[in-house]
């Protein structure tokens, strides 16, 4: 009996230790024992800035993961009104946010936190020799624009109309990043994108300012989504975006004050 006792004690200790290390409840050590996920839908043009702010938010909230869905604002708004579980929505135009508000899917009034304007994006070698907005109507030039139903497309139409320039794009894309990609890859001679996107893609892409862009500056509203799964975290994230840290990150990226 005395010889078996130590073996029994060791076996018991192993069992206890194994039980302590069990993560069968679905909680891993990386989530801080009860991790939560904040889901943010945001316009594609916010990819770089919101990714940075997301890391800041996670650093201040151990155990919290910020999950982003970046894309065309109109498509994101449609997903929200169709019931997607989302905590925060940041759109690239008040008109797009209005569709969410009108559907009763915004908790409280949205707040415009920044503004953005268009530039002409050209590849770094500028094969089309584009010098300004009037060059966009030149025959043979491959121009790419956003679809008119998304904020960057609506802004492009307004700016081009103000310039009196008629453009026949070779394609219309669902978000500004898709336009930027075609320009960067040399599949287009030029495209209209937000200033911040052209700056983020430098030096592969160069942005050309034009005066008429001032007629189509887009305001970016942000709101907590109604029935947000993480309502308290949503409010805190919005506070970060609206606060000093958010303003610094946005300004450094080329966004304008609201």
What are these regions (language model features)?
Residues 1-9:
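Bacterial N-terminal signal peptides that target proteins for export
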Residues 110-118:
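Short, glycine-/small- and polar/acidic-enriched structural segments
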Residues 103-110:
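A short, gly/pro- and small-residue-rich
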Residues 87-91:
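Periplasmic-binding protein-like
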Residues 4, 17-59, 65, 74, ...:
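Exported/periplasmic ABC-transporter solute-binding proteins
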Residues 8-18:
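Bacterial N-terminal signal peptides
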């Amino acid at each position: 009996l005395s010889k078996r006792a130590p073996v029994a004690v060791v076996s018991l200790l192993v069992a206890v230790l194994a039980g302590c290390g069990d993560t069968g409840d679905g909680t891993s050590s990386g989530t801080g024992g009860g991790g939560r996920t904040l889901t943010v839908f945001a316009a594609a043009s916010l990819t770089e800035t919101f990714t940075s702010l997301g890391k800041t938010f996670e650093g201040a909230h151990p155990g919290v993961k910020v999950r982003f869905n970046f894309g065309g604002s109109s498509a994101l708004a449609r997903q929200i009104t169709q019931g997607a579980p989302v905590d925060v929505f940041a759109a690239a135009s008040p008109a797009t946010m209005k569709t969410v508000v009108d559907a009763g899917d915004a908790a409280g009034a949205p707040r415009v936190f920044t503004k953005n304007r268009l530039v002409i994006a050209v590849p770094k070698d500028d094969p089309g020799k584009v010098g300004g907005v009037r060059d966009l109507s030149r025959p043979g030039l491959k121009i790419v624009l956003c679809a008119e139903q998304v904020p960057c497309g609506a802004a492009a139409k307004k700016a081009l109309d103000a310039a009196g320039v008629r453009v026949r794009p070779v394609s219309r894309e669902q978000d500004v990043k898709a336009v930027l990609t075609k320009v960067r890859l040399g599949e287009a001679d030029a495209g209209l994108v937000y200033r911040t996107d052209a700056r983020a893609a430098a030096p592969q892409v160069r942005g050309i300012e034009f005066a008429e862009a001032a007629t189509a500056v887009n305001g970016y509203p942000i709101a907590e989504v109604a029935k947000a799964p993480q309502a308290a975290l949503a409010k805190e994230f919005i506070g970060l975006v609206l606060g000093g840290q958010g303003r610094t990150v946005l300004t450094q990226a080329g966004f304008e004050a609201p």
